[in-house]
């Protein structure tokens, strides 16, 4: 009886350590993202993509209107430092 309890306890501990490792790894990979305006006058897709990748190599670009119905601005989403 003690051996089965000891085995169950060992399996529970190993399982807990594995779960905590997976959760910690997922939390480590999630980063905070920051936004910066690369070009506030206009947003042409190729130009915006180029400017964003030059300024932030891991950045993703997006054209967002400055005001409803207004001109689009080039925004770059990148990992915060």
Curated annotation (Swiss-Prot):
This is Putative defensin-like protein 148. The lineage of its organism: Eukaryota, Viridiplantae, Streptophyta, Embryophyta, Tracheophyta. It is found in: Secreted. Keywords: Antimicrobial, Disulfide bond, Fungicide, Plant defense, Secreted, Signal. The keyword Disulfide bond applies. Pfam families: SLR1-BP (PF07333). One of its GO terms (biological process) is killing of cells of another organism. It comes from Arabidopsis thaliana (Mouse-ear cress). Residues 1-24 form the signal peptide.
């Amino acid at each position: 009886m003690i051996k089965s309890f000891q085995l169950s306890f060992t399996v529970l501990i190993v399982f807990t350590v594995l779960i905590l490792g997976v959760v910690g790894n997922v939390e480590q990979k999630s980063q905070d993202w920051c936004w910066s305006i690369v070009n506030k006058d206009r947003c042409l897709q190729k130009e915006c993509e180029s400017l964003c990748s030059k300024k932030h190599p891991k950045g993703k670009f997006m054209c967002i209107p400055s005001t409803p119905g207004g001109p689009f601005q080039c925004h770059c989403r990148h990992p915060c430092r």
